[in-house]
Amino acid sequence: MCARPSDKKIQDGPYDLPEERLQNLVELLEGYGRPFMLTSLKTASKLGLLRRIVLICLKNTRGMVYLQKHTESAPLYAGLWDVSAIGSVFAGESPEDAAERELFQQLGIRGAKLKAMGTLPYTDSRGASLSATFFLAGPSSWRPQRDESRSVDGMFVDQQELEGLALHQQEMLTPELIWAVQAGWIFRKAGGPFLAG
């Protein structure tokens, strides 16, 4: 004889937590990129555990991409130019939702069209394992409102300027930005190692 299932709701997981609590947790991923556990962002970062992040490059209506320069006191990549926005994907959040949230929190940009260019696992310079989804956002006519606690400068660059920096002055750029340029995810590759034809 089969037991009758209980009508009582079982509180069996952290996803039953209030939304404001979930926004402080990240999903740790197993080897196939599937979430298996929740933890705080601080714990995941400290231990270098595999988690998801988003990288976003914002383009204006002229096709130029916005870059931000990290502060000299930034814990990672101090003083280097980086993608427009970067951030963690919180528990229960899609990468698209995280990209929209980060664009608004870091640059004050809302409603920009997002296009996911790809997702790749990598290890950052601190040894943290990450699954990064790269997005192009825009074109947007809104001027980014830089968060001065995160960056000391911001600028729009065109394809030739960005590819010139990535080819000749890599020491000024984050590895993630160089990777995105070389992959042709910001501007299409037309010839050469990653230069426009």
Located regions from the model:
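Sterically constrained small-residue positions within well-ordered secondary structures
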Residues: 19, 47, 74, 125-127, ...
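Unchanged
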Residues: 87-172
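Short, mixed charged/polar active-site loops
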Residues: 35, 65, 128
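Charged phosphate-binding loop/patch that engages nucleotide di/tri-phosphates or the phosphate backbone
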Residues: 173-197
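Acidic, metal-coordinating catalytic segment for phosphate/diphosphate chemistry
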Residues: 3, 10-55, 61
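Conserved Nudix-box catalytic region and its N-terminal flanking loop in Nudix hydrolases
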Residues: 43-60, 64-101
